[in-house]
A protein has these predicted regions:
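Thiamine diphosphate
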Residues: 1-70, 89-92, 99-206
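Short, surface-exposed connector motifs at secondary-structure boundaries
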Residues: 15-21, 76-78, 139-144, 169
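Proline-centered loop/turn at the N-terminus of a beta-strand
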Residues: 17-19, 45-47, 80, 104, ...
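Short beta->alpha linker loops
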Residues: 27, 85-89, 151, 176
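Conserved glycine-bearing catalytic or ligand-binding loops at nucleotide- and phosphate-handling centers
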Residues: 84-100
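General beta-strand structural signal in soluble alpha/beta enzymes
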Residues: 21-23, 48-50, 81-85, 107-109, ...
């Protein structure tokens, strides 16, 4: 396990003018934290891809189940992190991350089988570029907002359908990137998460 060296090599390649990327298990991003932090300080366009992002794949036990890693990476200044919910959001994540030339990015992926969200029924994945978007909405003002990232978005969609059948007005917000969501105007952020709707449920493995 040489994640620290892998991250350091990517930083060197980026300094030489190349566009490097590397991948590993999310749990072992702990070993890569110093080179990731350096790439942020140096504004290097390194792309770090981490898989096995939750307890959803548990064959290897708790040593391989990430809990606090998402919070640590999100707290690193200058790093853009995206956690897509399905194949459509993965494609949009690449479209968003590749043009970034002056900051490192982290793409966090699941390993277990996940459904591909039907975009004929739900909103297109292009909203990922703004960090968060309304995936499904209620008729009228929602009673509750269900927020999720990554593999948990599918769970929230199921909850939305059940609540809808029970007459509860719910909105589903896919929020693959917290820091990207800070960039759009406040008017957009308020349209996704209206301040007047305080009943909110966030679903994530950590």
């Amino acid at each position: 396990v040489r994640e620290h060296v892998m991250g350091s090599i990517c930083n060197g390649l980026a300094r030489a003018g190349l566009r490097p990327y590397c991948s590993g298990f999310l749990i072992f991003s702990d070993y890569m934290k110093p080179p990731i932090r350096l790439s942020a300080l140096m504004k290097l366009p390194v792309l770090d891809i981490f898989t096995h992002d939750s307890i959803g794949v548990g064959e290897d036990g708790p040593t391989h189940q990430p809990i606090e890693q998402l919070a640590q990476l999100r707290a690193t200044p200058g790093v853009t992190l995206i956690r897509p919910s399905d194949a459509n959001e993965v494609a949009e994540a690449w479209r968003t991350l590749v043009p970034m030339q002056h900051r490192p990015s982290v793409l966090v992926l699941s390993r277990q089988n996940l459904p591909t969200i039907c975009r004929k029924t739900y909103a297109p994945a292009s909203g990922l570029a703004k960090g968060a978007y309304v995936l499904a909405d209620a008729d009228g003002t929602p009673d509750v907002i269900l927020m999720a990232t990554g593999s948990e978005v599918g769970l929230v969609v199921k909850a939305y359908e059940q609540l809808k059948a029970e007459g509860v007005k719910a909105r589903v917000v896919s929020m693959p990137s917290w820091d990207l969501f800070e960039a759009p105007p406040k008017s957009y952020r308020d349209s996704v998460l209206p301040p007047g709707i305080t009943a909110r449920v966030a679903v994530e493995p950590a």
